[in-house]
Amino acid sequence: MASSIDSHMTESTADSESESFSLTDDEIINSILDILARTAPEIRNGLPGRRVKTNEENPSGESPMEADVFADELLRNRLGSLDGIGEYASEERSSADDTGSGLSVCIDPLDGSSNLKSNAAMGTIAAVYDAPLPARGSDLVAAAYVLYGATTTMIAAVEGNVADYVIYQDGSYEPIEQEVRVPSEPTVYGFGGRVPNWPRDFNSFVSDIESDTSMKLRYGGAMVGDVNQVLTYGGIFGYPALTNAPSGKLRVQFEGYPIGYIIECAGGASSDGSQSLLAVESNDIHDRTPVYVGTPSLVERLEGALAGKADSE
């Protein structure tokens, strides 16, 4: 039977010579992950009746879907009431909510919510910082994302370890892989943004990737789904700086830091084009950054291409 993350991380398996896998002994982090997992079926069940836009405007100047607001409020209520959480911030809120004292949590409640209409994959991203917001990448103590795909799963990263969980309809869950690693041989790629707005050096890099017959395009319009392809099969995902958006589209605190942390904990690499995503400076919770993550050899090639090196392979 499935049980809580805390029990999966700490209990001994009676019929096994080895102890069960443990991400952390920190009870607060375990509780955060537990809430994310147990809330996932409620978010998923709430999607069908919330597939239209609201009349509101979020900090990005966009009209969120009703599902975005629903997921945000649900997670705010659950996480904000947890002892040991000092701040709750989300992409849908202009500023962080003061919830007491302790860790800071940044949430992208429904990454890829534009996929609701086409019924494609989407997810929830969480970053946990041991510092006030806006935090630094070095302040991360845990990160996770829930993927609402054919099944509901959660990738969780803590202390250099990454585990994959399947989440059942009743909110229970169990690990399906306890030491997730980015495959060393890349096979998939996916890049966001309109092609006419790609910088020339990035466009050239993409052309080189596309000419490799061993590589397959996997892009679905929700970063968590595309990143999960890379985490599963090896490869590269990127949302570049654009000619009309030099800082890119994705947000440092909600997407860049946590996804970079997860991929690096799994043995992959992350970059903003010249350095690790975890080294990016952020002075506002809604700061943006270009995002590139994946197999280290490809991320290194990308950085070389963006630096104008003639031979980045």
Curated annotation (Swiss-Prot):
Ranges of compositional bias, category Polar residues: 1-13
Gene Ontology annotations for the cellular component aspect, listed alphabetically: cytoplasm
GO BP: any one term: sucrose biosynthetic process
Associated pathway: Carbohydrate biosynthesis; gluconeogenesis
One Pfam entry name: FBPase
Binding residue positions for substrate: D111, G112, S113, S114, Y219, K249
Binding-site residues for Mg(2+) 1, renumbered to this chain: E91, D108, L110
InterPro entries, alphabetized: FBPase_C_dom, FBPase_class-1, FBPase_N, SBPase
Top EC class, one word: hydrolase
GO molecular function: fructose 1,6-bisphosphate 1-phosphatase activity; magnesium ion binding
Positions with biased composition (Acidic residues): 14-23
Reaction catalysed by this enzyme: beta-D-fructose 1,6-bisphosphate + H2O = beta-D-fructose 6-phosphate + phosphate
Keywords: Carbohydrate metabolism, Cytoplasm, Hydrolase, Magnesium, Metal-binding
Start and end residues of each stretch annotated as Disordered: 1-23
Record's subcellular location: Cytoplasm
Known EC number: 3.1.3.11
Named cofactor requirement(s): Mg(2+)
Sequence similarity: Belongs to the FBPase class 1 family.
NCBIfam families to which the protein is assigned, alphabetical: PRK09293.3-3
Subunit structure: Homotetramer.
Protein name: Fructose-1,6-bisphosphatase class 1
